[in-house]
Amino acid sequence: MSNKIKAAIIGPGNIGMDLMFKLMRSKYIDVDTVVGIIPESEGLALARKHGKKTSAEGIKAILGNKDIKIVFDATSAKAHLKHAPLLEQDGKIAIDLTPAAVGPYCVPAVTMEEQLNCKNVNMVTCAGQATTPIVYAINKIADVKYAEIVATISSRSAGPGTRQNIDEFTETTAKALEKIGGADKGKAIIILNPAEPPIMMRNTIYTRVANPDAPGIIEAIEEMVGKIKKYVPGYRLKVPPIIDGDKITTIIEVEGEGAYLPKYAGNLDIITAAAVAFADEVAKKLLAEEQAKEVRAHG
């Protein structure tokens, strides 16, 4: 029995590379292969330098490889729509870091347990990971009628993939505020801030609620921040929640861990950290199943 589950990453951009470095610390996952479509890509060269198999043939290079059980897709929403059915036919678990949203929205602090058997999960967006759990926490106590989030990220942290996905980004984030957050209506706005030095990712979450129970709301928000901090240490409340009648304003800042990407790229850090937190649990489950099979075979 292997001690780790083999995985592949499609898309060697900012997110794909940050994922690779985070997964290199995982106790349960071994990144076997990194694939892209540009032979001279810096990401593929970096993956090779770290001993990973690489290919510029895209998804073709991993289809049919039975050893690879989990595939992280860090390409674009349009590309994932093509990849999803191919990965499913090949029996691979897809963790989608694009806003394609083929599978259910996955926000580990809220949905982890119920999704461990899913064959395709969507990591929403960086803003979705940062804001949906807060809306969920407020909704449990106060019934959120409307949620609007403004995610401000450094222009420098937005690579070509993020920029191509802006429309899908706002749409997917708004839907997650409703589906996972529980808001009756959700809206998302993203702002790319060109300031130098680059700013930290900041998320302002406005909610209107039916039952404004201030102490209950503050407690629920603080508890949720604690849960997220376990897998995103740089996640924090910028100021305490501001409660004005039925309006609640929560401001969250996300500082990246600064291992591969700079600390201001908290927007990328939160989605890769969430993907790894979820993937580790899936891999743990697969390893336990492998072990049980071996015990039965030798029993």
UniProtKB/Swiss-Prot annotation:
Keyword terms: Aromatic hydrocarbons catabolism, NAD, Oxidoreductase
Top-rank taxon, per record: Bacteria
Keyword Magnesium included in the entry's annotation: no
CDD domains listed in its UniProt record: ALDH_C
Catalysed reaction equations from the record: acetaldehyde + NAD(+) + CoA = acetyl-CoA + NADH + H(+)
GO molecular function: acetaldehyde dehydrogenase (acetylating) activity; NAD binding
Enzyme class: oxidoreductase
InterPro entries in the cross-refs: Acetaldehyde_dehydrogenase, Acetylaldehyde_DH_C, NAD(P)-bd_dom_sf, Semialdehyde_DH_NAD-bd
GO biological process: catabolic process
Binding annotation for NAD(+): 157-165, 267
Keyword NAD: yes
Active-site residues from the entry: 126
Enzyme Commission number: 1.2.1.10
Family: Belongs to the acetaldehyde dehydrogenase family.
Name of the protein in its database record: Acetaldehyde dehydrogenase
Organism: Carboxydothermus hydrogenoformans (strain ATCC BAA-161 / DSM 6008 / Z-2901)
